[in-house]
């Protein structure tokens, strides 16, 4: 049996705070750290000192880039709970960093979605919400900034329902709004809560519900109780009998339905004004899952069968690395989430994806950017290890006697690339090291050398993503670099099926070369990727040469068909061929495979694909005509329009190639008043005139 734990697993919460850029997520996290007694002076993003935003660029830009993991403890607003441990993973809200969000969601058990009471559900919230649905993460909603002009709690609740297709259940109502926002009504306790300004909301008073709100409170309280009662027949019977449920029963019913992802309890407040975050912490304990409430994590056992690890100290150790960060003091930090078992510093672990064994040096628990060294971590913990050499994001680390590979994370392909060159000879060597480290930290960032031009090319998820990489290179590694113009990551594919022979024969003195294959090349659904099938019967091409044929095809796919861009979404089947006892070799079959693909693909109606971005522009009405006209000029397809307090919202799909420098153009079109967000949506066929121009340029 494992030794006793300081805090039982069912009193642990691993949560993320997700939000749109300006919903106030960082301030909310800050307040959480303040009330849980970790940070003594509250950081404000406006002053650029927030505890969670520990990379310099974040402090300058006021947006959160890296998900730092922080541990804190909470006993409840009235000290009504035994001690709970809450691990918070901060997730970025900016669209170029959806990869970070994806990583955090992967290791969370629950999440708090922060919405701005004025802006409501913004496009970024929708993206993150969809990601959270994919990982089945139970969530709470917190409508923040209730003190701002234009604040409207119920409008946001309706947007959560309409835009996110969720089932929001308010468990609080605000008392007043804008500058009259005074506190909240706790619908479960039927009391008004007013936090004391004097001690920054550390204490509060309970009072009766204001007269003018009683009818409204009654209406929303009934909705909440009905939602709780639907969790079980037993509660429903009790509710139908008595017409009410006790606070314990309400919480029990709401918890059950939140964990099942059937409802989203909604709270409100103003983190900046120190109101409501304390009750939000209580809700995290009341409604979000502990590691024992979520299904056991699945994976692949060493023998290839499906396995799982449940959250317990007694199971073999298994953890998932979800973030790598370079730290100026200790070197590489690997953040990981422990799913099962116990790990002590000094233990050896196995990385099944790389097939390597490593020894764990120091173990650290983070509080934003200060750290505490710990001796061991247990199931459900989130910590960082120092000095792991081979582990990259998404890798499993586990006990060597009980090997399991936890499901890998999927990372999106980069859509934009730029050439980068060092300014001086001295920067040359440092640049390679710096880019290597940054690529290890961030799987959505890639580096390669262009064979023809010998330039170093960096690829990423958007202009901002690459700007920040170049910026970090300058600050953290002192490398000055010149950056070329951004280039779009086009792809190629085919539209019809063909069958093609590839025959490679060289009869020179001594041993010759002989490889002969017939390939069927077929288009696949967009996004389906590459598939290679061996349909050879009767051994007309021996088994050992098949991988060489596939390799030849893959290499040729990288070189493109017409424009030199990678080929995607094709299925290649080898169905016929011949070989020579003496002269056949892997080399010959690789060349034959590559010849057949090159020849065949060029007859299969090849087309050029370009990345299409989902763009949402928010603009004051008076600039609407100019903004839409400009988007049409950029080959934009308008998908819809909507109203919001911030102005008109235009949803549009635009080719990435037309979006370079858009930020500057939009600023001048709207005198700086319009804003936009952009994320990758899909690859689509480029119109023939555009494709021809690109092919010409490439050749």
UniProtKB/Swiss-Prot annotation:
Chain sites annotated for binding GTP: 19-26, 90-94, 144-147
Chief location: cytoplasm
Subcellular location: Cytoplasm
InterPro entries referenced in this protein's UniProt entry, alphabetically: EFG_II, EFG_III, EFG_III/V, EFG_IV, EFG_V, EFG_V-like, EFTu-like_2, G_TR_CS
Biological process terms in GO annotation: ribosome disassembly
Keyword GTP-binding included in the entry's annotation: yes
SMART domains recorded: EFG_C, EFG_IV
Function: Catalyzes the GTP-dependent ribosomal translocation step during translation elongation. During this step, the ribosome changes from the pre-translocational (PRE) to the post-translocational (POST) state as the newly formed A-site-bound peptidyl-tRNA and P-site-bound deacylated tRNA move to the P and E sites, respectively. Catalyzes the coordinated movement of the two tRNA molecules, the mRNA and conformational changes in the ribosome.
Listed name of the protein: Elongation factor G
Gene name per UniProt: fusA
